[in-house]
């Protein structure tokens, strides 16, 4: 039997576990975040042995479904129609599931409980730092997308309340920049400053209800469309093979639950790779059904004229859609602080490690540093959200990073784990797994490079 030796030189990867804000980074919003001592004792936390198989499926589905749902009809349009969109998602699903299984295997081998800790342990210091930077940038970009979504939905709701026609200019207090800023300062900033997050369970509930309600509305509106809604051109084939790849960021952003998955795996009553394979397969099939239902019906309802945020394509006066907009706003208001908390914890760990200051010796300045980090993060995301026109442009950038979490880092972990096995004669399965790891890294690097370059030179500079 192969012996696995996972980079056990702890001096090389000095981990930051607590900077006054213990965070199991990017875990599912259903999980309470608490200091380490509370984490291990809390009955509501993700303690090892407390989560059933069915519960794990729910948590993974919840972590997967989110704001990216609104962009899926536009992704089908970008990909070139229903057939291309379905084929792309089905092909991606194999790699998405395998990446989740690889992370569970490496977590078990390295005895680490979070995504970035697994990467640190298996791949070493440099890759670990790159992973943490990627998580920080990804959460930062997602926070920008959340603020844009708030503005999109508020515009439609305010238009109905003020009884203004579509596109008409209203009073200054209905201006998009003012309403986003007011909402952010009144609700998001106060929720982002605290050291701990105790409202994650409510965010989880709102997220689940909002996601399923949006999907139901999109499907119902396709089956029984309003008379005034006429679809644009219904594409049946992609304009080019590059057009198909331009839909990749949305799919990667939508299905990226890999960073959240490692704590969930370690929380299971039976944290076994085989059991986990069944969990993630079931969860991804459920998520696929939701994304496909929204993507197909939203695209067929509006065709090529669909907005990057599908809810913007519906009339402002539609009350059923207005309820969906309200759900999305409430969900985003509670989800932003959670994503910010995760990004802040990563930045904190990187900063303390760079300074060479042990966490225990720097607790005294934690509050001042936390408030400063929160204000800088909040103001930068707000400023960018005010001037970026739609979520499609943000997703096109951070979707490339999501590809790294799905493909690149799991692929590197698989390669390093297999290379660490001490066997004189390598069996065929060893070569197959190493080759598959190389394929994952290559494919992920290509998607990241292509989508990021396209986002910069086509979307952002257009």
From Swiss-Prot:
* Keyword Electron transport found: no
Report the GO molecular function annotations.
L-asparagine transmembrane transporter activity; L-asparagine:sodium symporter activity; L-glutamine transmembrane transporter activity; L-glutamine:sodium symporter activity
Q: Which residues get modified to Phosphoserine?
A: 28
A Pfam family matched in the record: Aa_trans
InterPro entries per record: AA_transpt_TM (IPR013057)
Its localization reads:
Lysosome membrane; Cell projection, Axon
TM ranges: 56-76, 82-102, 130-150, 178-198, 205-225, 239-259, 282-302, 319-339, 371-391, 395-415, 428-448
Q: Does the record carry Signal as a key word?
A: no
Summarize the protein's role.
Symporter that selectively cotransports sodium ions and amino acids, such as L-glutamine and L-asparagine from the lysosome into the cytoplasm and may participates in mTORC1 activation. The transport activity requires an acidic lysosomal lumen.
Entry-linked PANTHER family: AMINO ACID TRANSPORTER, SODIUM-COUPLED NEUTRAL AMINO ACID TRANSPORTER 7
Q: What is this protein called?
A: Sodium-coupled neutral amino acid transporter 7
Organism of origin:
Homo sapiens (Human)
Lineage, uppermost ranks: Eukaryota, Metazoa, Chordata, Craniata, Vertebrata
